Amino acid sequence: MKQYTILRPAPGGAFDQALISLLKQLQSHFLAEASEGRRPVFLRFFLSDAQNQASALKKALEGFPWPVPALSIVEQPPLDGSRITALSLTDSRPADFLFHSLRLSEEEARGLDSYRQSRLLFQKYLDIIRPLGLTLKTHCVRTWIYVRDIDTNYAGLVKARNDVFREEGLSHLSHYIASTGIGGATEGRSETVAIDFLTFPHILESEKTYLKALSHLSPTHDYGVAFERGVRLADGHIFISGTASIDHRGEVLHEGDVLAQARRLLDNIGTLLAEGGSSLERVRYFVVYLRDISDFPLVDDYLQRRFPTVPRVVLEARVCRPAWLIEMECEAQPE
């Protein structure tokens, strides 16, 4: 059985103190999980300042006593004041997926706009999976795309993804891929785009059900982007893409009201989950993205009251349309 946990360091102190605190928590957590028959299979670290923190984190992980599972590191400052927060996945079964957190070196990224950086990252992924006999269309189940200065650079990413998907045989007549496209950064100063790819090498197309919720959300291709709202796998596990306050016409709802947007996006997520045979009560964790850090106390209090037992992390990250003040993603189990 999968177990999702969000871990935070003790409050206060410099980054090196926060890192020591968090890694101690991770060691204790993995030891407790091992006693329940689960082992670590995935970690994502959210940093407040990747350029000053990522190298120290990577060095610390080299000496970490537990085998480091699939790993992602992104700058999306946690809004509870933590300098670093971790999302951990442990499982009683061996990992049945491949995870590639692809980044560009300074030399690769320098001088390239977001379109060309995105094309290069997709090409890197294709160069990895093709020798394994895998395809983007069938075996890539989920992506997370992080865009620095998303208000400026999102359009280039969208065009690149559309072009790659067309070349690889993905369209609105077949399917796209569940995804989050969100503001985020890496330690690379020239890198404007970074992509995490989740791949299931043994999956069949018939084992994926794409969730639409057309009563609440428009098809993404209606407004020129290419991703699925969510996907349900054969075992009932559901990945919900980054979801905002949108209606069936593709319009932003409740401009300027972050709580009304939160309620609407959760209504959208609930409708997607119901289509996949699940519900908000079966969500395993939430990742919450806020455009304006001033909204954190209001949103965090609302989520605590509505989902007091569901792990969550609330991050500073701008959504792809400026009018969207909040976006959320999650994973869920079947009823």
Q: What role is predicted for each listed range?
A:
Residues M1-R284, Y289-E335:
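N-terminal presequence-like segments and the immediate start of the first folded domain
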